[in-house]
Amino acid sequence: MEDEISSFFESSPPQKNMEEILENLNEFIKLNSSSQGGRRIVCVTSGGTTVPLEQRCVRYIDNFSSGNRGAASTENFVKAGYAVIFLYRRGTCQPYCRSLPDDPFLECFEFSDKTNIQVHTSHLEAVKMAVMDQQTAVAEGSLLKLPFSTIYEYLQMLRLIAEALKDVGPCSMFYLAAAVSDFYVPWKSMTEHKIESGSGPLDIRLAQVPKMLSVLRSNWAPKAFCISFKLETDSKILMEKATKALRKYKVHAVVANELSTRKEEVVVVSSSGNVVVRRECDKPESFVEDNLIRLIVDRHSTYIKESHN
């Protein structure tokens, strides 16, 4: 497995702006680490990874992930006092923007006269809260946003973040809500230019993406609290696969969610038993992530306490 992981990174295209990303990351961690600012730090991954089919990518394989869970969870982590490294897919849902329309620039604003625009009265409160909450989180140094698109970018940045958080130890957490591709086209076997469509049917052989969770737990950030996710469309196999992932990767909990009910309830699978977490149906503005993050924060507190004993 380690050979496969090494081979994946060695053959991946280099991450753009790596030095700038690392500088921002280290500055953020220094500001918020327990020896400096006293905050716990969580890396929330969000959205889905793309699989390019050409090196100069025109076509790619994608998944449906909108990033809603990662965005909602980030808001709750900030509210709970965490500093959040938000590793997100470009173009997916952002923290504090979930109450805005799909096209906020065009739907939230109107002309006040021929030259000036203003927020439409029907969206005024939502825009005000979104801007205020976002700016407060950034100004207080509790939110760092890092974008990705491809499977290559995501895994290179996840490794970078994990290694940077290694010294933070138990006060760091990984909340891995991103939908990571299981299969990909190795970079060296890709055509450079756009695949021609006039040559008939297209046959593509996909390789399996090496499972990085095990090396994150064992090498990159072994003392960090780690939460992974398992999504299935078949509820009959969901719990079995979540339990298997818990044992195989030695994470602290697996959040099991079934596609059709994922916005209403999830099951947190851990060595101490399974806990069903539901959205509070009597509160229209509530989300399942509200209760989920409360539970995860409590579990993290216990983990930190036990680590210091």
From Swiss-Prot:
GO molecular function, one term: phosphopantothenate--cysteine ligase activity
The protein's annotated pathway: Cofactor biosynthesis; coenzyme A biosynthesis; CoA from (R)-pantothenate: step 2/5
A GO CC annotation given for this chain: nucleus
Reactions catalysed, as given in the entry: (R)-4'-phosphopantothenate + L-cysteine + CTP = N-[(R)-4-phosphopantothenoyl]-L-cysteine + CMP + diphosphate + H(+)
GO-annotated biological processes: coenzyme A biosynthetic process
Alphabetically ordered keywords of this record: Coenzyme A biosynthesis, Ligase
EC number: 6.3.2.5
InterPro entries to which the protein is assigned, alphabetical: CoaB-like_sf, DNA/pantothenate-metab_flavo_C
UniProt keyword tRNA-binding present: no
Subunit note: Homodimer.
Similarity field: Belongs to the PPC synthetase family.
Described purpose of this protein according to its UniProt entry: Catalyzes the first step in the biosynthesis of coenzyme A from vitamin B5, where cysteine is conjugated to 4'-phosphopantothenate to form 4-phosphopantothenoylcysteine.
Protein name per the record: Phosphopantothenate--cysteine ligase 2
Gene: PPCS2
